Amino acid sequence: MFKCPERVSIKKKEDILDLPNLVEVQIKSYKQFLQIGKLAEERENIGLEEVFREIFPIKSYNEATILEYLSYNLGVPKYSPEECIRRGITYSVTLKVRFRLTDETGIKEEEVYMGTIPIMTDKGTFIINGAERVVVSQVHRSPGINFEQEKHSKGNVLFSFRIIPYRGSWLEAVFDINDLIYIHIDRKKRRRKILAMTFIRALGYSTDADIIEEFFSVEERSLRLEKDFVALVGKVLADNVVDADSSLVYGKAGEKLSTAMLKRILDAGVQSLKIAVGADENHPIIKMLTKDPTDSYEAALKDFYRRLRPGEPATLVNARSTIMRLFFDAKRYNLGRVGRYKLNKKLGFPLDDETLSQVTLRKEDVIGALKYLIRLRMGDEKTSIDDIDHLANRRVRSVGELIQNHCRSGLARMEKIVRERMNLFDFSSDTLTPGKIISAKGLVSVLKDFFSRSQLSQFMDQTNPVAELTHKRRLSALGPGGLNRERAGFEVRDVHASHYGRICPIETPEGPNIGLITSLSSFAKINEFGFIETPYRVVRDGIVTDEIEYMTADVEEECVIAQASAELDEYNMFKTPVCWARYKGEAFEADTSTVTHMDVSPKQLVSVVTGLIPFLEHDDANRALMGSNMQRQAVPLLKTEAAIVGTGLEGRAAKDSGAIIVAQEDGVVEYVDSYEIVVAKKNNPTLKDRYQLKKFLRSNSGTCINQTPLCSVGDVVTHGDVLADGPATDKGELALGKNVLVAFMPWYGYNFEDAIIISERLIKQDAYTSIYIEEFELTARDTKLGKEEITRDIPNVSEEVLANLGEDGIVRIGAEVKPGDILVGKITPKSETELAPEERLLRAIFGEKAADVKDASLTVPPGTEGVVMDVKVFSRKDRLSKSDDELVEEAVHLKDLQKEYKSQLAQLKVEHREKLGALLLNEKAPAAIIHRRSADILVQEGAIFDQETIELLERESLVDLLMAPCDMYDVLKDILSSYETAVQRLEVNYKTEAEHIKEGDADLDHGVIRQVKVYVASKRKLQVGDKMAGRHGNKGVVSKIVPEADMPFLANGETVQMILNPLGVPSRMNLGQVLETHLGYAAKTAGIYVKTPVFEGFPESRIWDMMIEQGLPEDGKSYLFDGKTGERFDSKVVVGYIYMLKLSHLIADKIHARSIGPYSLVTQQPLGGKAQMGGQRFGEMEVWALEAYGVAHMLQEILTVKSDDVSGRTRIYESIVKGENLLRSGTPESFNVLIKEMQGLGLDVRPMVVDA
């Protein structure tokens, strides 16, 4: 069996932990959302299940009718992902929900169709209307509590906290300049502030004594001794002191005890007092008690309502319901598990499951938060303010959660409709069922809207496998509920210490989105709360163990973490007593005895794409950023070639991107061709795994997706082996560019300003040739004037033009086409208004003629040349207009299909029986297996499974079997569920194919008779103007293609393939490219491939050793000879191999010229841009240039007849036709526009003729 080439490395020990599945972020999240493969009763309260449980039951206003949710059921996709792309439809499954309706007539259960729901492909993408899309994960501010501080204009530091729910009103508490705390509800309504004491009372703490008891510890103090009396002066009362007989109040709770007051209390015969420990008159709580205008629960509620809703009558009922709605109603206010977890953690409340399930606000939360705020104000060392840019306070909303939120809003809309229908339903005339009151429109429209319009649902970047992979791992701070690009400051965009191992500090776009769109680091995972975790090795008693612990940013703060490069001895103990470590985001030299954890790998800091840059540690960060971004723009080449100098991540990136085909199970290759690989399974050779290869498909970016087999018949394969290469891969490794022999030297000035000189040899060898595929589509519709027709019979078109069209009017596959050629001939009925008067007269005299149609053919647009590589035709079949022959042919096809279906079903049954037999035969049943519906015991506990029992189980459905939880039941469940899914899928495929034979493409849009898609492939060779780049941010444009004979050559006669400017290195500080040049040269000469992983690559000394071993110059420089003259250049030049990429900015797509084209409606000036077939704007500065040369006639021509002089344009055309070289310019249309605008302002502006 073919194996990937082994790369040479100087790394002594491999990483302790393998990279996780790189698209797990997407797949895991959506799996949890839908919980596919789980029985209804096994589903957890998450995702779609959670949304249904939240919204239901729905009750009518009089509570006589109740609609309850029972379970949902997902169907099987009708078409495969490839077929959905081909047909331009959405890859989805049907959603059916079982409801129970209870009303006065009884209980009814019904399964209701709720539309379709898009499902994710194995690669982590969605197919929406035939286009692959990715839902980008969003980073947003975590729900919970944040403590902040800001400086007042007077210099005081004011502390505040903010309780942010997942859904609902924000609650803010802010200290003012007088040390009083005010509450703000919702930031938008900040003007309406409420004193915190009033709010506390409104929560139910009515008396001052209750409040003091909450905030202070209360002590009962005796008044018997004189020393007690003296000690109590200046203390604060914790309760009212009241005379029991006369109800006379001697002192109120919160009052400061004076000597006079104490005497009065003593005289009244009071023996002891309740004192608030630690309280004084300057304490914020005591200050607020004196300032509070209310003194009871009722008064506080009314005051709260008045401030929240000024102008409305403040009744107790209204006030109570408002505060309940705001913070204590789960439908309107929800902290979520995350918010509750963060709040409890900060305030020191328990973190058990029961507590975390409380999603609304509690009184204790407000009191706890106020206590913490006061401690913060008092300078308590155990309290701290929160950094909002820290990853402990920012979480990730992945695809599942984003769609869940949209489903919630869709079902909430449905809830209102259901309630209205319940109340308006006429029970006397009809029976109410769930299907009659449920409308699925709300849910369907919300999902459709999200996938097609949301800022986070993006058209997948499919330029190459790396671009695809990065897009799925992208994190965005933009989007609904996120930040705004214009308002985001520097702090949010900046690299934070907590990003280490979680978010890549390098990979981010240049421009306005810098720092807002980022990428997950290579080892990072997202936990159940949405926080990003990174793995560390646990260190115990100075010994680095192999135990791995995933930690969030807040947990990491308390750990001392050593670098992965710290040297260890054979016992996994640190070699030195001191090593570099991190603690609370700061790097320092730590005593190894204090180290608690160690990095898993040096590359855990960076993302996958950044990890593909060799010698990253020698590059400036700005250039590394460009290098990361430009790898995503590399075009897959016709002849792929893996990099000589790699980093070791190439194989994994190719595998997880889904570009290559990997063996799912061990086995032997039984059959291989260009379209399919068949592997017989090792355990059971009768069972086969079939792998379909993708052949010359068009990607989203127009590049070519083509897979080629790497294995041969008889090869023994193991799980994970590469079976076929894909686009931009070579023997299972990523191959984005070519290894090129490069010289760093100036050459006749052609590599000025980063320009690149290339040898013609690269063109001859097709080194940088790539294939582009363009799709052209044409539809024939049934219009009001009649049916459009796809035909070869097109009016006023010569036979030469139609040479490549078949009898049906569609271009033949293999035809070479150029701009203007017809791809599909189409005629459309003409309307009366489109006919000239003489045509109408002839029609009236001679009746209808065939010429009453116009040519609406699909032609090749400008700038496109190539070969027609595929044609797809979709059409509906009319049952009534089928001929007898067609009906006979249809019956034959259906019979063949049924035969194939039965044979596949029989094969499935055999496989199922064998799987059951392998698991159960002669085994003892650990528990009884009961039939769920009939309650019959199918297998007794302890019974031995024989062939008869296995055949009995084989006929049963998983839904009908009940067994006590055990290992055997779990395996049995997996076997039964996978069998049921396979049978269901086979059945759906059979029905779909049968439907297609009978009715054609029934899923075409309404009114479409026929749809034709033509794919034109063009071969693009490297040419002057194309952009190229290395992996270190060293980019440039091809300036000259030099004949091989003229290129500089080495002493051995070998010509250099590319020349780069040496001035591109020192100022850019990307020395990685120089080290890559030297190592590449040494490795190429030795005939090996090397890997130099990030931060643990080849040291300089090792590279020099390799060069000396291969007999190359020690300094890496060689004398070159001029190909033109044969003379030696004066100085030595750095020569070596660099991996260079061709980027998707091809000159062929950018170059553009206009002779004639469209004009703007108002100004009558030519439009701009290639897409509009626009002209080149001759602006103000260009006018100055021509004025400076005094070319008046040329200038006049450019500003009038070549632009917006309408009459002049017509005249100049006539004069050119007649052969007259005469320019008579008129008035430019823009002048007329100016006149009209001035007239619009009421200024009477008219050109006047004045006699000379």
From Swiss-Prot:
A GO MF label: ribonucleoside binding
E.C. number(s) listed in UniProt: 2.7.7.6
Mind naming one GO cellular-component term on file for this protein?
Answer: DNA-directed RNA polymerase complex
The record's section on CDD domains has: RNA_pol_B_RPB2 (cd00653)
Q: Which domain of life is it from?
A: Bacteria
Q: What are the UniProt keywords, alphabetically?
A: DNA-directed RNA polymerase, Nucleotidyltransferase, Transcription, Transferase
Q: What class of enzyme is it?
A: transferase
What's an example GO BP annotation here?
A: DNA-templated transcription
NCBIfam families per the UniProt record, alphabetical: PRK00405.1, rpoB
The name of this protein is DNA-directed RNA polymerase subunit beta
Give the species.
Chlamydia trachomatis serovar A (strain ATCC VR-571B / DSM 19440 / HAR-13)
